[in-house]
From Swiss-Prot:
Any Gene Ontology CC annotation: P granule
Name the UniProt record assigns to this protein: Vitellogenin-3
Residue numbers of Phosphoserine PTMs: S177, S178
Processing after translation: Tyrosine sulfation occurs in the female only and plays an essential functional role.
Tissue: Synthesized in the fat body and ovarian follicle cells and accumulate in the oocyte.
Signal peptide from the UniProt entry: 1-19
GO term, biological process aspect, one: sex differentiation
Amino acid sequence: MMSLRICLLATCLLVAAHASKDASNDRLKPTKWLTATELENVPSLNDITWERLENQPLEQGAKVIEKIYHVGQIKHDLTPSFVPSPSNVPVWIIKSNGQKVECKLNNYVETAKAQPGFGEDEVTIVLTGLPKTSPAQQKAMRRLIQAYVQKYNLQQLQKNAQEQQQQLKSSDYDYTSSEEAADQWKSAKAASGDLIIIDLGSTLTNFKRYAMLDVLNTGAMIGQTLIDLTNKGVPQEIIHLIGQGISAHVAGAAGNKYTAQTGHKLRRITGLDPAKVLSKRPQILGGLSRGDADFVDAIHTSTFAMGTPIRCGDVDFYPNGPSTGVPGSENVIEAVARATRYFAESVRPGSERNFPAVPANSLKQYKEQDGFGKRAYMGLQIDYDLRGDYILEVNAKSPFGQRSPAHKQAAYHGMHHAQN
């Protein structure tokens, strides 16, 4: 009798386990995420073009990306397969005067080291992640390069500002924005360094290549060049790696490759709107995350479109809170590029504190001054001890930063005054 009860119990457990497995599998069916009509209307990767995404309204383009992402995550039918050839990846070494030295990924280390003074100060390496044909991308990269040229030419700018102020003292000119900029440059810190643009985005000539990019292997390829740089005398402590969109994850993989082979970490990796990874290998973790460098920060500008809502760094900034796109972005590509525009603005001398932010879980909490912790500044001059999620408000047009101080929460504000 006892053995019969045991058999019945075992049978019930097996049935329950099987039912639970069926229920779990049922939850993973695409029809549980999308309607049958929506599934039928999910376009293939070959049907999506960059031009189409730029011409579609932001919300419409975001829905297309979301559908592809969810179906791919459930069906696991998108396996990364595209790794650009190093000889096909353009690289530009930007001199302090703005002049570009063009080379390729397979020879940029030697070309860079041949430049006078290269690697004596900070080295900033930017991995693009959007097609170079995009007007939004062209403008974003132009602004970023201009900002770094200004930063590395600050001593000359300060000299020019002093001369300009001397001329204005003997005139009746009104105080204008150019004079205000001159005052900002006077108080900014002088710095020098080198800027390298690895134009990975130029190899993403169509959306399918973008979706099928092998982040891990491409990152390992980039990481090897960073190892070559340090082997030629460039300390990892002065390297700042910046990844845009999908290339934010490439930057993370590059950092992992560097650490695995050298036992050291890069000083900093910044993700400019880290993307949703549309294709990945099952059971393999990937993507930008804490630990890929000594310090990892990310700016999210299209969390519900091409960007990911997942925390990627030691500190993550969400301008205007997690959203499809930040104010002023009209399509999904422009929404991604805005993170680059924001970062560029923070690089420009005198604008380092244009983006005050506070720790908060939502824009509503931020506006109600119900956040927690102290104010911080998004962008280049970030404090490396920051941790958590930060919210801030931005303008729809340039200048994007709202220079007025971010909200101080009641608790922190009171504690601050009590200490002073």
